[in-house]
């Protein structure tokens, strides 16, 4: 087979796999992933990648719905089943499927697990590479409404756990915004 995919108990080709519209990864980027290359149908550093995957999930309160050894066996099996000996193996866990809402309680309670393997090759080690440099501003773009809202999900959950409605975010002494609301400050109030 050319490629193979798994999503919450269903196995098919990547092209035939369907994901629900209310999967939290599409709303919020609410999940973690790891990826590894395979050479001769063997994933490189599989255990290291899977340990990091489980550790990442734990840090954002996602319980991966498959034990480590079972997931390891699935990845190995998928790598053997595809035609190409050189491939990319990918694993992803999300908070699951549920109606859109920042707090975890909207997630429906069951995390989702994705696995896929498709043909890919490592770039030759002796190849020349070109690069540019840019300042790392990945987390300074709260003015851009992307769907990568994992920090907002975490902040909203922490507010709920504290019995609060919202988390006000700041950089030093400057308020930037809230986890899922705008921040407005009235500094000069007058009674007329």
PLM features: what roles do these ranges have?
Residues 167-168, 182-185:
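Short beta-strand scaffold segments in enzyme catalytic cores
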Residues 1-167, 171-174:
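Conserved alpha/beta cores of soluble small-molecule-handling proteins
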């Amino acid at each position: 087979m050319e490629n193979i995919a798994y999503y919450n108990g269903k196995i098919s080709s990547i092209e035939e796999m369907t994901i629900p519209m209310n999967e939290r990864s599409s709303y919020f980027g609410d999940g973690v992933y790891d990826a590894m290359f395979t050479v001769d149908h063997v994933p490189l550093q599989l255990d290291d990648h899977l340990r990091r995957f489980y550790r990442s999930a734990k840090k954002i309160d996602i319980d991966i719905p498959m034990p480590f050894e079972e997931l390891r066996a699935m990845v190995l099996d998928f790598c053997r089943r595809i035609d190409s000996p050189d491939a990319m193996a990918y694993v992803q866990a999300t908070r699951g499927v549920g109606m859109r809402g920042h707090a975890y309680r909207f997630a429906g309670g069951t995390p989702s697990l994705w696995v896929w393997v498709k043909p890919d090759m490592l770039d030759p080690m002796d190849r020349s590479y070109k690069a540019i440099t840019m300042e790392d501003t990945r987390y300074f773009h709260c003015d851009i409404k992307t769907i990568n809202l994992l920090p907002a999900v975490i902040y909203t959950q922490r507010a709920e756990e504290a019995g609060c409605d919202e988390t006000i975010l700041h950089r030093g002494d400057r308020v930037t915004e809230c986890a899922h609301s705008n921040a407005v400050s009235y500094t000069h109030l007058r009674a007329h």
